[in-house]
C-alpha cells in the first residue's frame, strides 16, 4: 500500500473552483436558480480565510451551501420583497456568525526575541510565532506552548549551539550562568511538534541576546544541528503557500530543500524571495534588522 501526499490548493485555485463549480452547484441545490445570489471575490476570500482552515475544499463547499440555504430562507420569509442579489461580507457574518478562524498575517512591527516560523498541519501550512524572553535565574530553559518532545529537543539544540558559539554572537561567557531563558509558542491549546522549528527558535534566541529585532517580513523553517548546520524539512509546498498568504516576503529555507522549489506554482514564487542556507551564520544578516 502506497500513501500519496497531495499538496493543498492555493487561495487562487480555491477561488477559481468556487466560482466555476461550487457556487453554481450550491445555488442550484438551494433552489435559487431564479434569484441567484452574487458572490464577490472579497466574500469568497472571507469564507476561505475566516470560516475554513483546510488544504482541500470540503469546508468551503459547506460554507457556501450554508450561505445559499440562509439566502433561500430569507427569500421565503419575505415574500414579495426584493432581496439584494449581492452577498456582502456583512451578510456572511449575519448568515454564518462571527468568524471561526483568525487569518494570520506577518507581524505589523519588528520585535526583539520574536521570530516567524512555518509549520505543517493537517489543514496545510501555517505561521507560528516563536517568542523568547530572558530573566535572572540559573541556566534554566523553560518551554511552553504544548510542545512535543522533538520540538523541545530542537529548542535545546538551538540554545546549546548559541552557548557554544557565544563569542561569535558577542555574548559574555558567563551570561548563561545567571539567566533563565523562556521559549513560548502561542496557541497553547494546540499541540506542536517536529524539527522544523529549530531554525526560527535559534533566530529568536539570537535576536533576544543581540537585541536586534527580527525583520517582520521574514519567515524561516529548518532543522538545526548542534554545529549550526541546517537540514531539510518536509511540507515546503504548503509552508510557502502559507507564507505568501500571510504577506511574508522573504523565506529562509535549508539549502537541501531547494529541490522542492520546482513544485511550487510560479504565481507563488514571484511573490517570495527564497533564501537557501546551509549554516545559521548565513541567515543572521538577512533575518535581523540593524
Predicted ranges, named:
Residues 42-134, 138-144:
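Conserved catalytic-core segments of large NTP-driven translation/proteostasis enzymes
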Residues 84, 102-105, 111, 115-116, ...:
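Peripheral, non-AAA+ core regions of ATP-driven protein-machinery
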Residues 26, 92, 205-206:
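Broad structural signal for hydrophobic residues in well-ordered alpha-helices, predominantly aliphatic
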Residues 1-3, 180:
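Short, solvent-exposed beta-strand edge segments and adjacent coil->beta transition regions
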Residues 4-65, 70-85, 165-174, 212-215:
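Conserved C-terminal "switch" segment of AAA+ ATPases
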Residues 2, 35, 273-275:
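Conserved beta-strand segments of alpha/beta enzyme cores
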Amino acid at each position: 500500500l502506497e500513501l500519496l501526499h497531495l499538496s493543498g490548493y492555493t487561495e487562487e485555485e480555491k477561488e477559481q473552483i468556487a466560482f466555476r463549480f461550487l457556487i453554481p452547484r450550491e445555488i442550484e441545490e438551494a433552489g435559487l436558480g431564479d434569484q441567484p445570489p452574487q458572490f464577490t471575490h472579497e466574500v469568497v476570500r472571507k469564507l476561505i480565510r475566516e470560516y475554513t482552515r483546510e488544504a482541500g475544499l470540503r469546508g468551503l463547499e459547506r460554507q457556501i451551501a450554508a450561505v445559499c440555504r440562509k439566502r433561500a430562507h430569507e427569500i421565503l420569509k419575505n415574500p414579495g420583497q426584493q432581496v439584494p442579489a449581492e452577498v456582502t461580507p456583512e451578510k456572511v457574518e449575519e448568515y454564518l456568525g462571527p468568524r471561526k478562524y483568525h487569518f494570520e498575517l506577518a507581524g505589523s512591527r519588528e520585535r526583539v526575541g520574536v521570530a516567524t516560523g512555518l509549520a505543517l498541519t493537517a489543514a496545510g501550512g501555517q505561521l507560528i510565532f516563536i517568542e523568547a524572553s530572558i530573566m535572572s535565574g540559573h541556566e534554566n530553559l523553560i518551554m511552553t506552548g504544548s510542545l512535543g518532545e522533538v520540538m523541545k529537543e530542537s529548542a535545546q539544540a538551538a540554545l546549546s549551539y548559541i552557548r557554544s558559539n557565544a563569542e561569535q554572537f558577542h555574548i559574555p561567557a558567563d551570561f548563561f550562568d545567571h539567566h533563565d531563558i523562556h521559549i513560548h509558542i502561542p496557541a497553547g491549546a494546540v499541540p506542536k511538534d517536529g524539527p522544523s522549528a529549530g531554525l526560527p527558535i535559534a533566530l529568536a534566541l539570537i535576536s533576544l541576546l543581540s537585541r536586534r529585532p527580527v525583520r517582520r517580513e521574514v519567515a524561516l523553517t529548518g532543522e538545526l544541528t548542534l554545529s549550526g548546520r541546517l537540514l531539510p524539512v518536509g511540507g515546503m509546498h504548503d509552508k510557502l503557500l502559507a507564507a505568501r498568504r500571510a504577506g511574508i516576503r522573504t523565506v529562509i529555507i535549508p539549502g537541501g530543500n531547494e529541490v522542492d522549489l520546482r513544485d511550487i506554482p510560479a504565481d507563488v514564487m514571484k511573490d517570495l524571495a527564497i533564501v537557501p542556507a546551509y549554516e545559521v551564520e548565513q541567515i543572521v544578516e538577512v533575518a535581523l534588522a540593524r
